Amino acid sequence: MTTPTPPVLLRTAGELHARVRRGRRAVVMTMGALHEGHATLIRTARDIAGPDGEVVVTVFVNPLQFGAGEDLDRYPRTLDADLEIAGRAGADAVFAPAVDEVYPGGEPQVRVTAGPMGGRLEGASRPGHFDGMLTVVAKLLHLTRPDLALYGQKDAQQLALIRRMVRDLNFGVEIVGVPTVREEDGLALSSRNRYLSTAERRTALALSQALFAGLDRHAAQEALCARAREVPATQARAEALSALGESRAAADAHAVATSAPGSATAVRDAARLVLDDAARATPPLELDYLALVDPSDFTEIGDDHTGEAVLAVAARVGATRLIDNVHLTFGPLGAAS
């Protein structure tokens, strides 16, 4: 087994620009504290760029993304470990600039604004967060000059906003979304997971469990729609309900039985039941939001929605704030998606 070549550590824009370009350049932007989710992004970038291309990982804890009372000073900084993980995953270079390298004139007076989508969900909970995120992404795209940039789907709203910025401002870079990586028990990988105590981690599992409950509800409803074309509706509903399992509470089952096929309300309700239980746990889960939204603009969808949707959740467990989401597709009434 060959030992991977350590990535070149670059600290300044001059060092980055002095590198001779070869093939396609793929960039993976991180705030450090790398984990398997980041490694998956880097490996995917390596596969897309190919052996003749170049993979650059950025490590920069962006102060503009942290609001008052958030965890900027607490955010883990583990550059030596990051270099090792990035190298094993196939990175050629790691660009880890200081704050004054990215913002040489101090806090920038001109910023990218996230628009209406940036004020919803995460933006409502963290005012200014997405303006700061888009500003640093724009700067890093200019500095790294990639052909493509990869981002995790766990940060679904961030990914949607980056795609919108790249389109609206003609950046000429391909944006690639990579599916969320999870622990065996379903918890989405996050650099902030290391803050959780054993008890807090047990409570935090409710985020993914709630999303999976929503997916189960959605699958049952879509199966009901498909079967409705072939058998009486009453029989189809009974079969769909059985797919949810006998462990569901009676009230939970009743919600499916009385909701319209493809009902967004029923999907939300199934997820909320899990979160309500977690709110009574020790330690409790403090829900920030649960939303079922259109991925094009992150507005809430209604029961008549067809097409793609994102079921998203954010909550605090102890001092740690976590987010997660899943994607699903609603078919038209009476038809499978």
Curated annotation (Swiss-Prot):
The keyword Cytoplasm belongs to this UniProt entry's keyword annotation: yes
Query: Where does it primarily localize?
Result: cytoplasm
Q: Which Gene3D superfamilies match?
A: HUPs, Pantoate-beta-alanine ligase, C-terminal domain
Q: Which parts of the sequence bind ATP?
A: 31-38, 152-155, 181, 189-192
Q: Which residues form the active site?
A: H38
Entry protein name: Pantothenate synthetase
Stated family: Belongs to the pantothenate synthetase family.
| Natural source organism | Streptomyces coelicolor (strain ATCC BAA-471 / A3(2) / M145)
Question: Which Gene Ontology MF annotations are present?
Answer: ATP binding; pantoate-beta-alanine ligase activity
Q: Where does beta-alanine bind?
A: Q65
